[in-house]
Amino acid sequence: MNVLRSGLVTMLLLAAFSVQAACTWPAWEQFKKDYISQEGRVIDPSDARKITTSEGQSYGMFFALAANDRAAFDNILDWTQNNLAQGSLKERLPAWLWGKKENSKWEVLDSNSASDGDVWMAWSLLEAGRLWKEQRYTDIGSALLKRIAREEVVTVPGLGSMLLPGKVGFAEDNSWRFNPSYLPPTLAQYFTRFGAPWTTLRETNQRLLLETAPKGFSPDWVRYEKDKGWQLKAEKTLISSYDAIRVYMWVGMMPDSDPQKARMLNRFKPMATFTEKNGYPPEKVDVATGKAQGKGPVGFSAAMLPFLQNRDAQAVQRQRVADNFPGSDAYYNYVLTLFGQGWDQHRFRFSTKGELLPDWGQECANSH
């Protein structure tokens, strides 16, 4: 009888372990060990100042939500509020850069904002409020989104409402600078429920993506001039590289039900064609000519997983990611991999409304 009981206990323990194993996201667990402090600070160790950015904090919040990791989410949120927002994301946009100063003090290094981190943070808070049924997250997310609209959205003659990359330094009297990778179309769709300026920002953001890629490659940065439009043949060559790689990934993550997805995929098809032909995405591309150079790092291959529509080409990039998985000193490659590979593994999807569809599963929900 004791043997039977012992065997039953062992089976139950193994079953519980297998459920827990099925619920965990190994790449996320490793990322936490390698890149997130116990206090909730996402660290980029490649910089000697051991920097933290609002982008990194916002991505950490998204991954924690996708993984149903509320403890990590709270840690990251608390650190962000206390160190980047002087205690409250309701009261101010987070500073974009924090790290070690020359005098060895740890503090904000640049108090300007970065709207890519801000929109991901607001969206993650709003979705955390919905999925975890926690009003506090919803309240902070709503206040943050209103502040983004007030401080980072401008009206551009000939375009309409546009999201600046930050609140300072990107707008002159007749010229504005934009980063096409800062507002994913899915998030732009989600924010339309909150009314102006988001209802029109979705369309102007689509124009930014579609009109600045004449050869099918999105620029990292682009300038718009009043009465002259997009400056695609500027004195300085426009490059598609480490920022723009996210554009293709965001487009690939759009739900198939979104009527704009096919149009976006068609616009950026040259990027898919190059990757399929060469077995890797390019590191840099001249936006005006379409001339590519260099082999993109492993994070670029991960970013291609949602974007590529050819299954054989997808498999090549999937294998490249598996064979060259980022280590503990490759923050940006790792976050691209969590996004791209995580999507490829069906750990999350987005609805037509831009809401998160996490793969928590009933067993996972019951095991927490």
UniProtKB/Swiss-Prot annotation:
Disulfide bonds: none annotated. It comes from the Bacteria. One of its GO terms (molecular function) is cellulase activity. Its main location: secreted. Residues 1-21 form the signal peptide. It catalyses: Endohydrolysis of (1->4)-beta-D-glucosidic linkages in cellulose, lichenin and cereal beta-D-glucans. It holds the Pfam family Glyco_hydro_8. Keywords: Carbohydrate metabolism, Cellulose degradation, Glycosidase, Hydrolase, Polysaccharide degradation, Secreted, Signal. Belongs to the glycosyl hydrolase 8 (cellulase D) family. It is an enzyme of class 3 (hydrolase). The lineage of its organism: Bacteria, Pseudomonadati, Pseudomonadota, Gammaproteobacteria, Enterobacterales. GO terms for cellular component: extracellular region. This is Endoglucanase. NCBIfam families: PRK11097.1. One of its GO terms (biological process) is cellulose catabolic process. The active site is at E55, D116.
